[in-house]
């Protein structure tokens, strides 16, 4: 689990194809300090497990499911990526709870200067636009591993926007991207849980109503 606060930008130094997916080696400084085999590091918002490390690099495997859902399918050697080590019980939670499980990609469709800030608009892939129901105005969304505040949404077209100040743009990879580029998106974890619970409760209620055993029935019969 992560906070969505990018610790540093690292650089991809090597990519190798494997039978199970990809092997990726990334250069970093902060995230490699005290790292151990088996530790989790978010790479552009994708939770990867460290399989090997050196003084300033770490290596991880990427499975096909992850490759298909994320921008790691387009990643190249020399590319800059956002990095964050997994949180601990003493980690300052300055962003929001991020799982490192990317839902889909989104395309940058516009970048407009707004005073000192820049307004970015994103459009979810059509087959994943149902995920916009978990993106709410003034809520949080994870973009390439960075926890950002949502300005507004357009559910019909799968579009949402965020506004970024210069400091943020200088410290995450989004500041280097342009219109037409794609980013990894992870939507709100709690929204997914609430939806699942409500669906389950509704299904259970329907079953009880069909059987004739409802809360009213139980109360009337002394239960």
Place the predicted regions along the sequence by residue:
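Conserved loop->alpha-helix
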Residues: 1-223
């Amino acid at each position: 689990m992560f906070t969505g606060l990018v610790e540093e930008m690292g650089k991809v130094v090597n990519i190798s194809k494997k039978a199970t997916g990809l092997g990726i080696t990334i250069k970093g400084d902060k995230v490699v300090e005290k790292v151990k085999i088996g530790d989790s590091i978010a790479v552009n918002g994708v939770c990867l497990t460290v399989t090997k490390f050196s003084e300033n690099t770490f290596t991880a495997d990427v499975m096909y499911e992850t490759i298909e859902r994320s921008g790691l399918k387009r990643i190249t050697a020399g590319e800059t990526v956002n990095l964050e080590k997994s949180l601990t019980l003493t980690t300052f939670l300055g962003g929001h709870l991020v799982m490192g499980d990317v839902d889909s990609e989104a395309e940058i469709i516009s970048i407009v200067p707004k005073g000192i800030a820049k307004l970015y608009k994103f459009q979810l892939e059509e087959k994943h636009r149902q995920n916009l129901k978990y993106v709410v105005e003034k809520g949080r969304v994870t973009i390439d591993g960075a926890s950002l505040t949502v300005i507004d949404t357009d559910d019909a077209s799968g579009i949402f926007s965020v506004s970024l100040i210069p400091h943020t743009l200088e410290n995450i990879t989004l500041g280097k991207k342009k219109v037409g580029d794609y980013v990894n998106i992870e939507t709100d974890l709690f929204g997914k849980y609430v939806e699942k619970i409500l669906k389950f409760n509704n299904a259970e209620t329907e079953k009880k109503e069909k059987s004739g055993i409802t809360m009213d029935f139980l109360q009337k019969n002394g239960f």
